[in-house]
Structure formats: structure tokens, C-alpha cells
């Protein structure tokens, strides 16, 4: 019988493993917002699989649908062939998500991960424009494959490529330019000035909230300005909603409050409902220009994820979940503001929006230490930002009041303990 012992992982698993170092236990069961390890210790999950478990662990309706599908010998693997499960997912996505929002997109299944979705959007934007350069933004994160890394800002991640990452240009995200806080004017000058050295891009790729980059949240005004820049210059707009989408910020798509219409939308993580690998790329019909098989892959048709993903879409047949997320988001915001006020020694700044919020502190290792103390007390939470300077709250969007308050209480305890023990010195 497996014991709560990490020796097999430490001895045989690659050194590249990361999350197990921050959460050093062997997990065994999970339900809703709770996890249990082999010792029976219970944890509140404010991590949600980095956004892959927006609906929590083992949602009962999704689980029963999947068990029935397996018991009936439903198709498991089918590449991009037509299956009943796939057809039902496409139909539900059209009728529950796209049509009520007056959105017109073709649905591409590029592979199982968010990076696959990003790669497909980059390739297609370059194909339809005939240009190679793509503009990304400071602190953006889009995946670990070469194309996705090329539009990622994090130096540590980029160095892992082992080769030059070319045909991309990085411009300042909203509020990155502290001195003027007007990155739009800066971006326009770079695009229009013949001496800037910036080749006309095929596309801009942007996140509305930079989940890995430090929970930087772009304003709706800034996003609308980015869309306007693209439209006026025949530049395609790729919206990476892999982490911020599927309800994480309150609305199904994180860009809905801004009222913009991207040319390509990248979705993965929670699109499969229960954490099963699935990615889709939404493509404006006029740019659906790949020839059959021009972008393919073995795992484009995860039927298990189609089954659970279809069931998950039922949450969006009315506005109850959306309103619930928005109400609980206000509770998270008020809690974080209260912690910043009570502990000025953190020099904290609240970041993000919706169910992806946190506190940034310039105090070295503070966010890491708070996340570590949370784990000791039974709360799973990670950090974000180029220097891991943000501790990041990512509860399931289906969490109830009891679960949310329990998690916030543990976090408050961790903040109080760490700030009391530490000699806090800003970086």
C-alpha cells in the first residue's frame, strides 16, 4: 500500500517537478473545494489546478455522466473524427455560450493544452496575414512550447527554450509604464514610427488578467484601445483566455465586460469541466483558413472531456453562477483590502479581479512564506509574478460560503503569523 512518503517521487521523477515541492504530501481524494492526503489530512483548495478545476473536484453531475459514458463503452480516442460526445459538446457550446452572446466563431480542436491553442492561433494569424511578427506584452504567459514561449515574458521560462525566440516583439501591458501609465500612446508610436524597428505584426496576443504574470488586470478601456489599434492597422487580435476564462473572472469569457471581439480566442484548462485535458481555439469564420490536416495532432478529441465539458456548460444556462461568482468576488476583494490595511508592513497591493485575486508585496520571499504557511494549516495556494511576489487566491468558482470563509480564515492566520515572525525588508 502506498504510504504518505515522497521518496519514490524524489528518487525517480525528474528534477523539473515543481508543485510537489510547494505541496509536499501525497494526495489521495478530492471533492468540491477539498483535498485529502494519504494521512487523511484535509485541505481547502485555493489553487484549482491553476485554473483547470473551476468547477471544483469531481462535480457530481459530471462524474455521473462520465461513469455512464464509460460503462456504455463510449468512444475514448478518436482524433478529430465525428463522435456523439463531440457533437453534443459543439452543439452545447454554440447554443449556451456563443449564440446568446451574439458571437460567431468556428471551433478548432488544436490539442489537449492551452499551449496547443496558442500555437494554432499564432500559426493561423501568420497564415492569413502573410506576416511573421507577433506582439505580446510584458509579464504575459502563454505556454511552454517554443511558439508560446516566444510570446511569454518571464525570463526564467524563456531561458528554458535553449534557443533564440524570434519573430515576436514585447510591448508594455496596461500600467506597466509606471512613470506615464499610458502604454497605449507608447504602443501606437512604436507601430507607426518608421524608426522604431518594429515590423508590422500579424497579431497581438493578450490576456485580460495575467494569471501567471502577477495578476495584472487590464482595464476595459485599455483592452478597447488595443482592439482599436488592431482594427485600424489590420492586425489580428488573439485573446488568451486559457486561465482567466470559463467563469474565473465572473463572466464566461473574461473579455465580455470590455465589449471587444477578438479574432481568435484560446481556451483550455476548465473548458473540459472536470480537469480532463481539452483545448479549443475560437476562430472568426473569415480567418478559418487552415487546409484539412494543416494543423493536427493525436489528442485533439478527448471524448471524456467532451462529456464532462458539455455537462459543465449547463452551469451557464442561466446567470446564477455568474452572479454568485461576482458576489463572492466582492468578499475576496474586501478581505484582501482589509489584510493590506491591517498589515501595512507587507507594503501590499491588491491585484487581479474576480476569482483570480491576490496581494503583491515587495518584501522578499513574503508571498512564498505565506503560501507555505497556508499549506501547513491546510490551505493550498500558489504564488505568481516574475519574482513570485504575489500570493494568489484561485478557489473553485462553485465554492460555497463555508468553504470560502474557511480558506480566508486560514490565509488570515498565515499572514498574521508570517508578518509577526519576519524581519520584513522590501526588495
Swiss-Prot record:
Q: Does the keyword Transferase apply?
A: yes
Entry keyword set: Aminotransferase, Pyridoxal phosphate, Transferase
Its cofactor is: pyridoxal 5'-phosphate
Give start-end of the signal peptide.
none
EC number of the protein: 2.6.1.76
Record keywords: Transferase included? yes
Q: Which pathway does it operate in?
A: Amine and polyamine biosynthesis; ectoine biosynthesis; L-ectoine from L-aspartate 4-semialdehyde: step 1/3
Write down the InterPro entries for this protein, in alphabetical order: Aminotrans_3 (IPR005814), Aminotrans_3_PPA_site (IPR049704), Dat (IPR004637), Ectoine_EctB (IPR012773), PyrdxlP-dep_Trfase (IPR015424), PyrdxlP-dep_Trfase_major (IPR015421), PyrdxlP-dep_Trfase_small (IPR015422)
Q: What is this protein called?
A: Diaminobutyrate--2-oxoglutarate transaminase
| Any matching Pfam family | Aminotran_3
Q: Name one GO biological process term.
A: ectoine biosynthetic process
The protein's organism comes out as Marinococcus halophilus
Gene3D superfamilies per record: Aspartate Aminotransferase, domain 1 (3.90.1150.10), Type I PLP-dependent aspartate aminotransferase-like (Major domain) (3.40.640.10)
Amino acid at each position: 500500500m502506498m504510504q504518505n512518503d515522497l521518496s519514490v517521487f524524489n528518487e525517480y521523477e525528474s528534477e523539473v517537478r515543481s508543485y510537489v515541492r510547494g505541496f509536499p504530501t501525497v494526495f489521495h481524494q478530492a471533492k468540491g473545494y477539498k483535498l485529502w492526503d494519504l494521512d487523511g489530512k484535509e485541505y481547502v483548495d485555493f489553487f484549482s489546478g491553476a485554473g483547470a478545476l473551476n468547477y471544483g473536484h469531481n462535480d457530481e453531475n459530471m462524474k455521473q455522466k462520465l461513469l455512464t459514458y464509460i460503462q456504455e463503452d463510449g468512444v475514448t480516442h478518436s482524433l478529430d473524427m465525428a463522435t456523439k460526445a463531440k457533437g453534443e459538446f459543439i452543439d452545447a457550446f454554440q447554443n449556451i455560450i456563443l449564440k446568446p452572446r451574439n458571437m460567431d466563431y468556428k471551433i478548432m480542436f488544436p490539442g489537449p493544452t492551452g499551449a496547443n491553442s496558442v500555437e494554432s492561433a499564432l500559426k493561423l494569424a501568420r497564415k492569413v496575414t502573410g506576416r511573421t511578427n507577433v506582439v505580446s506584452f510584458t509579464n504575459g504567459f502563454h505556454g511552454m512550447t517554443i511558439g508560446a514561449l516566444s510570446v511569454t515574458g518571464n525570463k526564467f521560462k524563456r531561458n528554458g527554450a535553449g534557443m533564440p525566440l524570434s519573430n515576436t516583439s514585447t510591448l508594455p501591458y496596461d500600467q506597466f509604464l509606471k512613470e506615464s501609465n499610458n502604454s497605449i500612446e507608447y504602443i501606437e508610436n512604436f507601430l507607426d514610427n518608421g524608426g522604431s524597428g518594429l515590423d508590422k505584426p500579424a497579431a497581438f496576443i493578450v490576456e485580460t488578467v495575467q494569471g501567471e504574470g502577477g495578476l495584472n488586470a487590464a482595464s476595459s478601456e485599455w483592452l478597447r484601445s488595443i482592439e482599436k489599434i488592431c482594427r485600424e492597422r489590420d492586425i489580428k487580435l488573439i485573446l488568451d483566455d486559457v486561465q482567466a476564462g470559463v467563469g474565473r473572472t465572473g463572466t464566461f469569457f473574461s473579455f465580455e465586460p470590455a465589449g471587444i471581439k477578438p479574432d481568435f480566442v484560446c481556451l483550455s484548462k476548465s473548458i473540459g469541466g472536470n480537469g480532463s485535458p481539452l483545448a479549443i481555439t475560437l476562430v472568426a469564420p473569415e480567418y478559418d483558413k487552415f487546409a484539412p490536416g494543416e494543423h493536427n495532432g493525436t489528442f485533439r478529441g478527448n471524448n471524456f472531456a467532451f462529456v464532462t465539458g458539455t455537462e459543465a456548460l449547463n452551469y451557464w444556462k442561466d446567470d446564477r453562477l455568474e452572479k454568485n461568482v461576482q458576489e463572492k468576488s466582492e468578499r475576496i476583494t474586501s478581505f484582501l483590502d482589509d489584510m493590506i490595511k491591517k498589515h501595512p508592513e507587507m507594503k501590499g497591493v491588491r491585484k487581479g479581479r474576480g476569482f483570480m485575486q491576490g496581494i503583491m508585496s515587495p518584501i522578499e520571499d513574503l508571498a512564498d512564506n505565506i503560501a507555505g504557511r497556508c499549506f501547513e494549516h491546510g490551505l493550498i495556494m500558489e504564488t505568481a509574478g516574475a519574482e513570485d511576489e504575489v500570493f494568489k487566491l484561485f478557489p473553485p468558482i462553485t465554492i460555497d460560503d463555508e468553504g470560502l470563509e474557511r480558506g480566508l480564515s486560514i490565509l488570515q492566520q498565515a499572514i498574521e503569523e508570517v508578518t509577526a515572525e519576519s524581519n520584513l525588508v522590501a526588495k
